[in-house]
Amino acid sequence: VGETLKLGISDVTCGTSTPVTGEAMTVTTTLFNSESTDANIKSITYAVGSQVLASATDVGTVPASGTLALSYDVSFDTARVYKVTATVVLEQDGKEYVFTKDITLDVLNADDLVYIGIDASHYNEYVAGNYKDSMGNFGNLAGKYNVRTVELKTSDELIAACSNPKFKTLILTAPSRRLADAQTDPRTYSAQELAAIAAFNAGGGTVILAGWSDNYENYDVIQNNPAIKHMAATQNEVLQALGSSLRIADDATYDDVRSAADGVDKWRLYFNTYGQSFLTDGVEVDPAHPYDRLYTEVFSHYGGASVYAVDADGKPTSTLPATVSPVVYAHSTTYSVDVDKDGLGGANVPKYAYAENDSRLLAMASEQLEGKGLIIVSGAAFMSNFEVQATISDNGSEKNYSNYKICENLLRAINPVKVTDIATVQAQTEAGHKYTIEGVVTSNASGYDKATAFFDCIYVQDETGGINCFPVAGEFKIGDVVRVTGVTETYQGENELQVSSIEKIGETTPVTPKVVTSTQINDGSVLGQLVTLKGFVVGYEMADGLVQT
């Protein structure tokens, strides 16, 4: 038995997390050579099917025991999902070898995109401060909703975004006071920046502010320099400019009881108490297992501060105005700590009534002022990579953090999903086009009743038509109203939607089968719909004891 050839393509990546039409994107192919002699690159080609996107010949050498990355720009004019195949021909020791590797690019329509600006100009934590470059998962999630995240790396970029109609939301995470560079240059918002952000919100833009625990300001360089404005004070200047009654506390949220139960640090908190807010729609809480992540979606709040409200005079108040909606409450055992001993945290931070005789600290809240955009305030960066897991499977058998669902609800509000009628989807003959449909389930999923289900799929129907959706797991049944997102595909002559996401959004009366003729059956005009046909069977074909046609 010979040894395996240690030569080929290790990876193909795209430099753009949200590819869009009409915009060049860089695709990089990394080659590896673990053999003892160099390998010449005879050619490299990028193609979608038979369409060549880019190609080159005699482009270099992959050194022995080394790697080489080759990058090329490609672009697309039509929004759809593309499978791009990289084909590389390598020559080593007089022999040629051909290697291929695919990358799937979900190219969005540039005209449908909206933008979220993420401030990176103030050493913002999780962006350009500590844990920098930790917003990628949120950016990838945003792309699924035709939303692109853009880091605003300078003051000019931040101000420009505030007047750009493509931008619908700004995210301002806490300006670091922990990073060494930030301690030397503790950045705050200029008068011009505050005015621009206020104008953005007044024009309907959503502004999200996140804090961080004053544990990350408990350093001699800060303690010995009263001129350094703390993170909470810096963020609160923005909130004041917006006319908001919400504030971020200069404190840390600790919990002795839950940290002991969970075996974590006192500031590593998992909250499970939610307010009445669209942001928490669909968040799962099992009253019988409120702390068990096998049953409940908890809110991850790491190293965070609390959130409170001020009255008309700017003084802390334990009464929330009608404009404010609590989103996430702390546990009843959670308390405020003044870690940096500046007298601003601790027992004087207001709590808010969650239930009778049960007032709690707030971890997150929103405010809707008349005629303005939404304001969302959190004591920590709830959308960082650590809180927004890329997929549920990242957590094994446990449920995902509710942060993920909160971000989904936020993105839906920023750019509502465009629902396409099923007839339009059926009319699309080219594979790879992404659509979202809503309709009534007309066949049970195997997860609900295997005896009456098709294999790993369901049919969904609206007023214009029906279509097969594959693959589908879960207990979806006849009469459920579902929202399905997927790409067009054809299987044995039948158009279908290759499902990327499906959710139940209601229930209704099951669809009544449409009475049709054999002509309609044969011409495909009712393909995918629930029908009934009257007539006589004159023939059928069997295979493995089952009727095939």
Mark where each language-model region is.
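Short tyrosine-centred short linear motifs in exposed loops/low-complexity segments
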Residues: 22, 78-82
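Short proline/glycine- and polar residue-rich coil/turn motifs
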Residues: 59-67, 476
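Short, surface-exposed patches at the edges or C-terminal ends of soluble domains, predominantly
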Residues: 33, 81, 89-418
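Short acidic/proline- and small/hydrophobic-mixed sequence motifs that coincide with surface turns
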Residues: 19-20, 36-41
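Short, solvent-exposed loop/linker segments at the N-terminal edge
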Residues: 16-23, 63, 428-432, 525-527
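OB-fold single-stranded nucleic acid-binding module
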Residues: 417-549
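Short, hydrophobic beta-strand segments
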Residues: 70-78
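Proline/serine/threonine-rich low-complexity linkers at boundaries of modular beta-sandwich domains
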Residues: 2-9, 509
